[in-house]
Amino acid sequence: MIASVIASVTASLAPALRAEQARIKWLVAPSSASWLEQAKARPDLVLIDHAHCERKAAGVALQLMFRYPSDAGLGAALSPLAREELEHFELVLQLLQRRGNALRPLPAPGYGAQLTAAVRKGEPVRMLDSFLVAGLIEARSHERMALLAAHSPDPELRELYGELLASEARHFGLYWLLCEERFGREVTMARLQELAAVETQALTGFLKHPEDVRMHSVGVELGSSPVGQLHADPCRIVR
């Protein structure tokens, strides 16, 4: 139900822009094979972190709604997104419980903090950057869930991540449309390229302790181009 609401809201935004069906490259570099192997080796740890990611994503959407209460249409766009993120949180939480694991605090990687630090102060650029950072995080989550859906040795986890892919694509698609509708394509694209470089830098390096693997821990292939769904079209409604 909520997924259809998000698709409906997204479809109502900037129809002329959607008609162009431009392919937007969100991610500069793909995740590394080492990250995938680390995540496969500690599936329940990544699952716990995934639950925290869904909870935080809901909080980001709500925070943006409260920050810009006078922005017409923003609440209608982000409210169903926040609800869907919480549905995903509950889904992951239930799976953790079935597997005998409890949600617990985990030290967060520096990924989110580095992206947040790149958000400029003052409006309206703060709004643009906040939307794009949220979209970049969703895009990276989508890319890594796709890897786990394809390569996890656990059928239960392959099914979970596969089911969530369409939602993640809708989410970063929605953030793109919110930016483009308010700031235009040229401004949005230029800033996306800058923040995408920050996103790659935040994931550059090698994990010193395997137990620190997270959904957004370090591990990208520099000089390689993301493939397939990584060149996602955020203007396309994914159902």
What are these regions (language model features)?
Residues 2-239:
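Non-heme di-metal
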